[in-house]
Amino acid sequence: MKKFSKTLRDNWIFLLMVLPGALWLILFFYIPVFGNVVAFKDYHMTSNGFIDSIVNSKWVGLDNFRFLFSSKDAFIITRNTVLYNLGFIFIGLIVSVGIAIILSELRSKRMVKIFQTSMLFPYFLSWVIISFFTDAFLNIDKGVFNHFLTSIGMKEVNFYADLGIWPYLLLFLGIWKGFGYSSVMYYATIMGIDPTYYEAATVDGASKWQRIRNVTIPQLTSLVTVLTILAVGNIFRADFGLFYQIPHNAGQLYNVTNVLDVYVFNGLTQTADIGMASAAGLYQSVVGLILVILSNLLARRVDPNSALF
């Protein structure tokens, strides 16, 4: 007990710094965990509040999960959610690392700051705002693309009914919005690499590409592994704004835009089935946890120093 008290006294300033984040986690992550019981109930809101509604709602076991995955759209939403996220993870990784390496090779610090700012800007834009820009290009009546097509004598294209372009467009927009944030982290790591490694490689006659391949990329391995493990944990979670706002929830596009989060939202707004929505959220969390553990075990087998825990 004395040792614990001494530790508190010696580190009180650090504990104080952690306190806001810890309170945020407790209030918005740990306390709401108890609400997962709704996933196993036929939840109906009563006038006596949330707790009373949970207590008095009937237990239905796994019925909410059965309803979620017995629908005809279960395969489509699972396929879309997983495949899009795999694209975001691996293509986004290549783009982010590539941009970070290019930035590290620039000698003008002013240019680096300009590029960093321009790349980070999309990260802070709302999907609602981005959807207006995409609509300005794709709209069948006043869109820039259709205006160009008609000006050269071609027929208008209804992009909001054309399934072919949307997987590529959504992948592009998702990576475009997020790669700036990731590339800044990789760039910061590259800037922290000991310059003597590069000097030794140069003395040995290594070309620029060989220095990147044998010095830069190995030094990024740990960060790449950690970020990939965390991303894999969210592979069953889709960016709701991207898949709902950009295609305007168009029914003709459901085969390529319908993901788990959009499906749950549409089901919730149409049927007000809170139990099913909770079941979907719990399913995403449990699968995400399992994937993080498995990914970490795999990373530990390959390189113990790169494992998350």
Predicted features, each with a name:
Residues 2-309:
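A structural signal for multi-pass alpha-helical bundles of membrane permease subunits
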